[in-house]
Curated annotation (Swiss-Prot):
Enzyme class: ligase
Disulfide cross-links: none
A GO biological-process term: translation
Function: Allows the formation of correctly charged Asn-tRNA(Asn) or Gln-tRNA(Gln) through the transamidation of misacylated Asp-tRNA(Asn) or Glu-tRNA(Gln) in organisms which lack either or both of asparaginyl-tRNA or glutaminyl-tRNA synthetases. The reaction takes place in the presence of glutamine and ATP through an activated phospho-Asp-tRNA(Asn) or phospho-Glu-tRNA(Gln).
This protein's name: Aspartyl/glutamyl-tRNA(Asn/Gln) amidotransferase subunit B
Organism lineage string: Bacteria, Pseudomonadati, Chlorobiota, Chlorobiia, Chlorobiales
Length: 475
């Protein structure tokens, strides 16, 4: 029997707010354990939560970006369960009345554009963190307790593991473009649970699903879903029954393992939090946030093609990340040459970022200085070959390209007399190749150009070298 995969994702996006969701403690990642805490984080008696306004605005922002309906009235609820890193014994979340509902995310997993529907986006707080790798003890770090999250819940519209990965990457791109999260999966800023089931092809009823947790990369999302598909298929083909459960992905072993039986909503005994008033969003707030939304990747790529006359492929690559697109546009503003700027950003800049494991925000060469380097090529001050040397020196020193060119004496030689002297010396030193060229082996022109450029240490104007060579070779 042939089966169809059905996947829905629950994505937890950690917001990059300065303070936590319901108190004034810092939400910054990486601090010493249990230092970013207060009576609210620790659930001490009498401590009352106060909702961070920025969390509401970020939720509305993401809702508008994904075409959701924004609820004018939504409610914060208590999700009750026991876990050592949840000191209150409940998590503040939303249930029956989320702030955003019925949205859409567009993906392309290689088979054309697909629309993945969203059930809801809701506000919740993160739990603390259990640490198991210090001796035989388990420790609790509550720095993360109360850090604001948005949970993005999709309909089960995904049909392959690649679509699931593409969807998660798209969500990450959206939240990064909006500036509400860094989307760092390694640090837990973006986490994903996958609800996976199989059903016979042609059936409309869903099969029993399992929830997969602990997937900390796009590749692991694909691998975990693929593994679970095969596990389900083997059980079904053997006449077995799929258990509704939560399973953990073990990346080292390449397999999932049972964690617990999958809970239903009623297991959490949701009810409105009596310590928090309803969340009210008026039309004025919606209109203001809508007016502040950035230009999104697809729109920006179309504009790049129209405005800068660069290929659609270049535009798509340059707009994957907002910061890279900004960097490109600033370099074009200075260089005046969009295609050259595109080539340099996609080539040399991205090479360095990849080799050094850096983000564009950490790149040492400012976009206006890259633009200045490209402008020097356009003005004939330096050749492209010399420009690459200058680029490496800029990486080390951070100096402006014009300063480096002057200091290192790298300006291009355009003195026709000096070039003619070198060309004549090369021709005199290679009589055999000269005779062969004049005998019809015109491909030897490249040999003579190379010799001349080598003699002048790459600083000769290539166009002038070609012109002088051709005149003398044909003479």
């Amino acid at each position: 029997m042939k089966y169809e995969l059905v996947v829905g994702l629950e994505v937890h996006c950690q917001l990059n707010t300065t303070s936590k969701a319901f108190c004034g403690c810092s939400a910054k990642f990486g601090k010493s354990a249990n230092t970013n805490v207060c009576p609210v984080c620790l659930a001490l008696p009498g401590a009352l939560p106060v909702l961070n306004r920025r969390v509401v605005e970020d939720a509305v922002k993401l809702g508008l970006a994904t075409g959701c309906s924004i609820a004018p009235h939504s409610v914060l609820a208590r999700k009750n369960y026991f876990y050592p890193d949840l000191p209150k014994g409940y998590q503040i979340s939303q249930f029956e009345e989320p702030i955003c509902s019925e949205g859409m995310v567009h993906i392309d997993a290689g088979e054309g554009n697909r629309e993945i529907r969203l059930i809801r986006i809701h506000i919740e707080e993160d739990a603390g963190k259990s640490i198991h790798d210090i001796g035989e003890e388990t420790y609790i770090d509550l720095n993360r307790s109360g850090v604001p999250l948005l949970e993005i819940v999709s309909y089960p519209d995904l049909r392959t593991s690649k679509e699931a990965s593409a969807y998660l990457q798209k969500v990450r791109q959206i939240v990064k473009y909006l500036g509400i999260s860094d989307g760092n999966m390694e640090e837990g800023s973006l986490r994903c649970d996958a609800n996976v089931s199989l059903r016979p092809v042609g059936e409309t009823e869903y099969g029993t699903r399992t929830e997969i947790k602990n997937m900390n990369s796009f590749k692991n999302v694909e691998k975990a879903i693929d593994y679970e598909v095969e596990r389900h298929r083997e059980i079904l083909e053997a006449g077995g029954v799929i258990l509704q459960e939560t399973r953990l992905w073990d990346a080292d072993k390449g397999e999932t393992r049972s964690m617990r039986g999958k809970e239903f909503a009623h297991d959490y005994r949701y009810f409105p939090d009596p310590d928090l008033v309803p969340v009210l969003v008026d039309q004025e707030m919606i209109d203001r946030i809508m007016s502040e939304l950035p230009e999104f990747p697809e729109e920006r790529a179309v504009r790049f093609v129209d405005e800068y006359a660069i290929p659609a492929y270049d535009a798509a690559v340059l707009t994957v990340e907002r910061e890279v697109a900004d960097y490109f546009e600033e370099s074009v503003r200075v260089s005046g040459d969009a295609k050259a700027s595109s080539n340099w950003v996609m080539g040399e800049v991205m090479r360095v970022l990849k080799e050094s494991y850096l983000d564009i925000a950490e790149f040492s060469i400012l976009p206006e200085r890259l633009g200045g380097l490209i402008a020097l090529i356009g003005k004939g001050v330096i050749s492209t070959t010399i420009a690459k040397q200058v680029f490496e020196l800029m990486l080390k020193s951070g100096d402006a390209p014009a300063e480096i060119v002057e200091r290192e004496g790298l300006a291009q030689v355009s003195d026709s007399g000096a070039i003619e002297t070198v060309v004549q010396a090369i021709l005199d030193a290679n009589p055999g190749q000269l005779a062969a060229y004049r005998g019809g082996k015109t491909k030897l022109l490249g040999f003579f150009v190379g010799q001349c450029m080598s003699q002048m240490k790459g600083k000769a104007n290539p166009q002038m070298v070609n012109e002088v060579l051709l005149r003398k070779l044909e003479g």
